[in-house]
Regions:
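Thiamine diphosphate
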Residues: 1-172
Length: 172
């Protein structure tokens, strides 16, 4: 098998992990990197997609959904994560909301120095808020999504999944 195929993160695998965790709502800000996952989520009858105009609003919406008994996940990019600091502090951490933030790690690379400050500051940002995180780069890492959900439940805190690769087209 071609190593390039093995090393990809397929949207089907990510969606499968979300379904295994019983996710009911995806609160997200659409972007070009999540297009393939979006097409699958849109067709999935067990998911409700909640689009937000700014990432900071995702935190309060997800907190309300969780308080009402739903099981949301937040899907945003790292730049939006950093824009959302006060909402994370007040809504998620302040209210003990056990939620997974799936964060696109824009600008990150395993192949040499990271040149984009969006990627450079993501981990220090998460550390400042004491938010634990898991890196998911390919399908072999997908079980870390379940680990993040388990940890969020156990700690009643947000936990991040850093998506270190763009979702690739349908692998069918």
């Amino acid at each position: 098998m071609n190593d390039m195929v093995v090393a990809q993160l397929s949207p089907e695998v990510v969606l499968g992990e979300l379904k295994k965790q019983g996710v009911t709502h995806v609160v997200w800000l659409p972007d070009s990197e999540t297009n393939w996952l979006y097409l699958l989520m849109k067709a999935e009858p067990t998911l409700t997609l909640v689009t937000v105009p700014r990432e900071g609003l995702a935190m309060s919406i997800a907190a309300g959904l969780a308080a009402g008994g739903a099981k949301p996940v937040i899907l945003i990019q790292n730049t939006g994560l950093m824009e959302s600091g006060d909402s994370i502090r007040g809504w998620l951490i302040g209210l003990d909301i056990p939620i997974v933030l799936m964060v696109g790690l824009r600008g990150w690379t395993r192949h040499g120095p990271t040149k984009d400050t969006a990627a450079t500051f993501t981990e220090p940002f998460l550390n400042a808020f004491r938010i634990d995180y898991y890196l998911v780069e390919n399908d072999a890492d997908a079980s870390r999504i379940a680990m993040a959900f388990d940890q969020a439940r156990a700690t009643k805190r947000p936990v991040a999944v850093l998506v270190g690769d763009e979702f690739h087209g349908f692998n069918k």
